[in-house]
C-alpha cells in the first residue's frame, strides 16, 4: 500500500502543476480593426444635345463598389490565455452615432480566428511544454480569409452615400458618409470560458475612387 502511494504522488503533483498555472489566469488582450474602406467608381451622367455634344449634368451613379475588409490586429499581453473567436456582432453608425445602412445596420457573422496565448516557446519553436514557455507579449493579425466584418449591404450603402446627384463628382472623399463599426467579438479562451472583446468606433474610409463621364 505504501508503494502504491509513492507511485501515485508524482502523478497527482504533475496534474496539479499543469492545471495550477492556469488558475486565476484570464484573457488580457486588445483588438483593433484598421484599413477598412469602400471605394466607389462613379460615372457623371450628362444629357446629349441635339447635335450630339455633351449637355447639362443629370446626376451621378455608382458603377462599382470596392470593399476592403481591412486588418484585425490583436495585442496579447504576457501571460494571457489564448482565445478562439467564433462570432462577431457589428453595429454600423455614422460619425454622430446614428444607425447607418438601416435596416441592415446590425450584422452578425461567424468567425474562426485563433488568437495565440501570451507565451512563446524557446528559439521560436512552434511547440514545447508549458514549463518551457516564457510569458511574452504577442502581436497577432487575423488571417485575411477569416475576416468578414463589413457586410455587403453596408458596403453598398457606403458607396451609394457618395452620390446624391446634386453636383458633379471628382475623385476623393467628396460627400461620402463617415461610417463607423462597433464590434463585439465572442469566443472561448484556452480553458473554455466564454469571452468578449469590444472594438468601438472602428473607422471605415469611404471615398470616390475613379470618375468617368457618360453622355446619354
Predicted features and spans:
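Sec-dependent signal peptide recognition
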Residues: 2-9
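C-terminal motif of bacterial Sec signal peptides marking the signal peptidase cleavage site
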Residues: 12-15
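Non-catalytic macromolecular-recognition regions in eukaryotic signaling proteins
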Residues: 17-216
Amino acid at each position: 500500500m505504501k508503494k502504491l502511494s509513492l507511485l501515485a504522488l508524482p502523478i497527482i503533483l504533475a496534474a496539479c502543476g499543469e492545471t495550477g498555472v492556469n488558475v486565476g489566469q484570464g484573457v488580457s488582450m486588445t483588438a483593433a480593426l484598421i484599413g477598412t474602406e469602400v471605394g466607389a467608381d462613379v460615372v457623371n451622367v450628362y444629357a446629349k444635345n441635339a447635335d450630339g455634344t455633351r449637355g447639362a449634368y443629370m446626376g451621378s451613379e455608382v458603377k462599382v463598389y470596392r470593399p476592403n475588409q481591412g486588418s484585425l490586429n490583436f495585442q496579447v499581453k504576457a501571460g494571457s490565455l489564448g482565445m478562439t473567436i467564433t462570432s462577431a456582432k457589428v453595429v454600423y453608425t455614422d460619425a454622430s452615432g446614428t444607425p447607418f445602412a438601416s435596416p441592415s445596420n446590425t450584422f452578425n457573422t461567424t468567425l474562426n480566428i485563433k488568437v495565440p496565448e501570451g507565451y512563446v516557446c524557446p528559439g521560436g519553436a512552434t511547440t514545447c511544454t508549458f514549463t518551457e514557455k516564457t510569458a511574452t507579449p504577442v502581436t497577432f493579425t487575423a488571417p485575411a480569409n477569416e475576416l468578414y466584418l463589413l457586410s455587403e449591404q453596408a458596403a453598398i450603402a457606403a458607396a451609394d452615400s457618395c452620390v446624391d446627384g446634386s453636383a458633379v463628382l471628382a475623385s476623393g472623399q467628396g460627400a461620402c458618409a463617415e461610417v463607423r463599426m462597433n464590434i463585439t467579438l465572442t469566443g472561448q479562451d484556452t480553458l473554455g470560458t466564454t469571452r468578449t472583446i469590444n472594438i468601438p468606433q472602428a473607422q471605415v474610409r469611404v471615398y470616390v475612387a475613379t470618375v468617368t463621364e457618360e453622355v446619354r
